[in-house]
Amino acid sequence: MANLRELRDRIRSVNSTKKITKAQELIATSRITKAQARVEASQPYATEIHKVMERLAAASSLEHPMLREREGGKRAAVLVVSSDRGMAGGYNYNVFKKAAELEKLLEENGYEVVRYVTGNKGVGYYKFRGQEVAGAWTGFSQDPSWEETHDVRRHLIDGFNASSNGTARYRDGLNTDEGQEIQGFDQVHVVYTEFESMLTQTARAHQLLPIEPVIETVEIPEADGILDQSGEPTPDVEFEPDADTLLEALLPQYVSRSLFAMFLEAAAAESASRRNAMKSATDNATALVKDLSRVANQARQAQITQEITEIVGGASALGDSGESD
């Protein structure tokens, strides 16, 4: 049986760790509410701009590069959205695993993969394994803002517009105006974690560009119109300026909003994952303290029993010695 002093030291150590995990759990819980509110607040705008883009795509004859796959595409950019901090359970591991699966699939299809990362954990993960990262942005995983993610969004859109035959500027948040010249790419994929519920967060791989799978460019007969959410036909819409001009102007904004929405989802998922991990750690610490306390009590009881036995034995020995005299 372990020494009583060692057991008490372990109990103190576990209780100290438990205070940390409990504090982290409470902090993560408070952040989830804020992150969820931001995700929900972005939904009305997302819904409306998606409707507008569908109408524009249906009314426009514009062959925009963002709406179609490039023939003979050579390079694909993969943005891996990780966290800046740890203690989030399997949050980052699941993202890295999904990214590896996507990269393997792209390489099998003949693409050269260009990896980009957000979050310190992603930077450290790939650096430790000696895997190249073309660019990284950090410092906003828990609470992303439109301004902080500006360079990420601008770089990916500029790189796609340049294509693998052209060049764009890599913007790292420090040299936004100048930037570093890099080769463009023909596809943009994002690997992030989707917030489904407090208990479920799932790593997803999403093709950001081209956005052909997102916007249906089928022609809609004018007489049929488009049905709204209630199933009623919506009124005809006239575009001013023309649909082609509006589509070309709004596509970059649509892509930027889509990417920013993924950052918001990832932030909520990160807080939920950290809260679950810290709650599990706190519960495990509580159970461990209970077990150690039981063992310590048994050790203490055994120690007391031994001391009593020694006292009784000593008294008996003294008694026997007196009788013999």
Curated annotation (Swiss-Prot):
It holds the Pfam family ATP-synt. GO terms for cellular component: plasma membrane; proton-transporting ATP synthase complex. Keywords: ATP synthesis, Cell membrane, CF(1), Hydrogen ion transport, Ion transport, Membrane, Transport. It is a peripheral membrane protein. One of its GO terms (molecular function) is ATP binding. It is found in: Cell membrane. Produces ATP from ADP in the presence of a proton gradient across the membrane. The gamma chain is believed to be important in regulating ATPase activity and the flow of protons through the CF(0) complex. Belongs to the ATPase gamma chain family. F-type ATPases have 2 components, CF(1) - the catalytic core - and CF(0) - the membrane proton channel. CF(1) has five subunits: alpha(3), beta(3), gamma(1), delta(1), epsilon(1). CF(0) has three main subunits: a, b and c. This is ATP synthase gamma chain. The lineage of its organism: Bacteria, Bacillati, Actinomycetota, Actinomycetes, Mycobacteriales. The gene is atpG.
